[in-house]
């Protein structure tokens, strides 16, 4: 009889532990979902999307790199101004001030897997009509058509995120706009080259994705990319 009571007690403990584990998982999942919806204004404000200045409040290091890059002045630099006859030619704007590379001018989202992005022509990318001085900003490369911020990593964030590691680690992403360079790159790979655009133009850096409190406490250091382009 004593052995039966011991066995019964063990089964009860295991059931209780399983219930606690499931409850903890559900609690954490619900908590993460609540956190993701904490600041919806970080991904959309009416008809406009927030600019890179909003991103700088948390992604301090990345913003400071981007603001000194050629992507940040893709609209304001003198060469672009002259070549477009003082911004008269509008067909270039999709790549120089993109609303997001994940949406075409027709409003249709690009292939969510990222595969179809390489066939999206630069003149088909929807250009934005606001915050032009930001050039190719954060949202241009990271904001999806359904207002989720995509990137190569996942993590707890006050806005919706989506991990698309394959897309952000391949040269096809850069080839959406850098079409002439992409042709040179394809010739390079046909000759046996293996390095991606990111490996050369976005050096690896080990750091936390976020530098602001309290969010940085929720992130471990990991290998990311410098946004100096």
Predicted region positions:
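Hydrophobic core
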Residues: 22-27
């Amino acid at each position: 009889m004593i052995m039966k009571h011991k066995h019964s007690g063990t089964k009860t403990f295991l059931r209780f532990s399983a219930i606690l584990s499931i409850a903890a998982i559900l609690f954490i999942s619900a908590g993460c979902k609540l956190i993701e919806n904490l600041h919806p204004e970080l991904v959309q404000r009416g008809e406009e999307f927030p600019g890179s200045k909003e991103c700088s409040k948390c992604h301090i290091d990345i913003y400071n790199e981007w603001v000194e890059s050629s992507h940040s002045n893709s609209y304001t630099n003198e060469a672009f101004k002259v070549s477009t006859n003082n911004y008269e030619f509008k067909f270039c704007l999709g790549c120089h001030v993109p609303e997001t590379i994940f949406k075409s001018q027709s409003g249709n989202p690009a292939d969510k897997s990222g595969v179809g992005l390489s066939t999206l022509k630069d003149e088909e990318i929807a250009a934005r009509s606001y915050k032009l001085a930001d050039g190719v900003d954060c949202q241009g490369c990271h904001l999806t058509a359904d207002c989720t911020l995509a990137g190569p990593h996942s993590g707890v964030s006050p806005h919706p995120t989506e991990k698309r590691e394959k897309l952000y680690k391949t040269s096809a992403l850069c080839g959406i706009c850098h079409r002439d360079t992409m042709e040179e790159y394809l010739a390079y790979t046909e000759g046996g080259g293996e390095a991606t655009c990111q490996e050369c133009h976005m050096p690896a850096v080990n750091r936390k994705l976020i530098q602001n409190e309290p969010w940085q406490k929720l992130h471990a250091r990991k290998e990311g990319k410098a946004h100096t382009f």
